[in-house]
Regions:
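N-terminal signal-anchor transmembrane alpha helix
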Residues: 15-44
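Aromatic-anchored segments of alpha-helical transmembrane domains
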Residues: 30-33, 102-112
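Juxtamembrane helix-break-helix junctions at the cytosolic face
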Residues: 80-95
Length: 147
């Protein structure tokens, strides 16, 4: 199993389930779309998808929140683009990239336990990200499964 997570040659050889590749493609596409939407229209996305009440903060604080939010989206976009490269060119790294995506989500959730985000209502972004994490776990298991 560890040989599949950390393959000696990183090439286009892939022995996991084909369904895992489709799941990986879907997850990467959604992450890229989410990231670009935040970078292009962060104010609206922060309020609607993530339920962050920006109007409750002074203008300078809201701008700082948006800047941090957008930088986080840029980092997520970079990770997602690396995942896309793995999907199309270095498929032996797909299981490792599933782990990277999963740890990225889990790390964020741990941080939010100590520094919670104040949200209004039940924003859809939280649910979408939880579903994407579930698909990531399923995809990881399928990518490690020998055909």
């Amino acid at each position: 199993m560890f040989d599949k997570l950390l393959p000696k040659p990183i090439d286009n050889t892939y022995s996991g389930s084909k369904i895992a590749l489709w799941l990986f493609g879907l997850i990467v596409f959604v992450h890229i779309l989410q990231s670009v939407m935040v970078i292009v229209n962060g104010h609206s996305i922060a309020q609607s998808a993530d339920g962050i009440p920006l109007e409750n903060y002074p203008a300078a604080a809201a701008q700082t929140i948006l800047a941090i939010f957008t930088v986080s989206a840029l980092r997520r976009l970079i990770i997602s683009l690396i995942c896309a490269v793995a999907l199309f060119r270095y498929r032996s790294a797909v299981p490792l990239m599933f782990v990277v995506l999963g740890l990225n989500y889990l790390g964020g959730q741990v941080i939010f336990q100590f520094i919670p985000i104040i949200r209004v209502g039940t924003p859809p972004g939280v649910v979408v990200n939880l579903i994407m994490f579930g698909l990531t776990i399923v995809g990881l298991a399928l990518s490690l499964w020998r055909r």
